[in-house]
Amino acid sequence: MEHTWRWFGPDDPITLDEIRQTGATGIVTALHEIPNGEIWPEAAIAERKRLIEASGLAWSVVESVPVHEDIKQGRGDCETHIARYQQTLRNLAACGIDVVCYNFMPVLDWTRTDLAWPLPGGGTALRFDQTAFAAFDLYLLERPGAEADYDATERDAARAYLDGLDESARQRLIDTIIAGLPGAEEHYSLARFREVIAEYAEIDAERLRDNLGHFLRAVVPVAEEVGIRLAIHPDDPPRPLLGLPRVVSTPRDVQWILDAAPSPANGLTFCTGSYGVSAAIDLVAMGERFAERIYFAHLRATQRENDPRSFHESAHLDGDVDMVGVIKALVGEERRRERDGGPRLPLRPDHGHHLLDDLSRDTRPGYPLIGRLKGLAELRGVETAIKQLAI
């Protein structure tokens, strides 16, 4: 498999020269400076590619070309934004880039409540605490109708949690949820966030799914024409939040997506950390079922807590994810592709604990150098063992 590393562009404090030392050969990145809904110019793509290749690496995957909210809502300038998305795909293909990751999560990208949760060994991890999230939803955001999503016990626990926070901790919780985590392209004030949430008041899961289908039927033929493989990323966590619908959370959702626009260009990002939050999903079985359409793998593990809706990001080989089984399934698919002439299979260590020098270095939450280096080394070790033992 192709070992890749997410890099956030020239402003990333982790340099391409450092990434090359990790053993990764491919870069996963995007033109983050271009606003959502705008066309990525071919010249800008080519220049970023030249920068990456000058360090002896390859631009392997785009993560992500963001999908504009007008497309998700099926409103406003939806068709204009779809046309721009199509042109961006053409421009990427003209530069030889052939895998594009994207998501269809309304408003929020991936969501956490704590960006530096202490680990027993002294490092820190990302965490989602259901009670903290409920406190934000009920008493900081004050979302209309939120009370119906929580029972009395949950509301009382959320109030008690909030009462235990000083003003700086309350603001930190707000910023963590709405200010945008790495990879998110939109950043909101609390007031603007309320307005954007309200725009989805009449959009349920069925309507959001219809809008996704419309998008797929428009962009998948273009992707197939120019030789790009689209890889949709799952919801994180894989369930509705803040009254917003989510439609990329289960194997059933994935099957619907593949059926909505049947094409080898229509595939998925297999993110074990996102799907793995759900105890109902057998990740190994899912990987085997959809192996042929997995065009990008995010390998990460999570550990569910006493309240199974709460979780923290564990070490890559720990937690609730059968990572050995997942990698075995991916190696099997890689062998099939090598035999049948299929496409390459890039993977990246998705997130990592902040360890050692990471704790004093200004890096993006979840994207440290040493923590991901450790994760990549562990994943490569499992892959090598499976291949050498012909498991």
UniProtKB/Swiss-Prot annotation:
Its EC number is 4.2.1.8. It comes from the Bacteria. It catalyses: D-mannonate = 2-dehydro-3-deoxy-D-gluconate + H2O. The lineage of its organism: Bacteria, Pseudomonadati, Pseudomonadota, Gammaproteobacteria, Oceanospirillales. It comes from Chromohalobacter salexigens (strain ATCC BAA-138 / DSM 3043 / CIP 106854 / NCIMB 13768 / 1H11). Coiled coil: none annotated. Residues 334-359 are annotated as: Disordered. Belongs to the mannonate dehydratase family. This is Mannonate dehydratase.
